Amino acid sequence: MKERRQCVFGRLWRWFLTVLGDIKVYRFPRFMVYDPTTFAVKGDDTRDIMDVIAPGDVVLRGYHHYLDGFFIPGDLSHSGIYVGNGTVIHSVAEGVCEIDLIDFFRCDRACVMRPKDGGAAVAAIEKAKSLIGSDYDFNFVDGNGAYYCHEFTATCYSMLGIEKKKTKICGIPLRRRYLGTSFTESDKFEEVIRINC
């Protein structure tokens, strides 16, 4: 019975977090939009990114006014790895998957970070490809074979010793986690391009 309750709770938790990531809230006039389709990063911005991006780059994105932004600190709430051929591997609610670069950058803020060690980029791409199909880590626990987005990216670059950051939600301190700033503030990466951040 306890197992069944945990299973039901787990499914509800996954559904809640998935829906939370698709709701945009406007303060004035006050209204909500589910799964909006307009973003501040436009086609020209994406073309600028495509002109400079290289395989192994860490790609980060963020959104204005999304509910999940209240729970994920920083301007860049999602990350992945550009693996070449116009595709990004990242971890989302459905698990680790490969998507088109243009789809990845349907967002309001964007940043591309390049590892200073080119050899690390090659290893990170191989690791990212090997993790396709892994589950999303809804519990944000290390070492369980599932990955939240920044954990996935940091795992692919584990050879660089990516640093976890202190986090707070509503002023309440939580355990250290990988965040967008784990990459943007790291001396192991250099910024290639930043849009609307």
Regions found by a protein language model. Name each.
Residues M1-C197:
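Cysteine-nucleophile amide-bond enzymes
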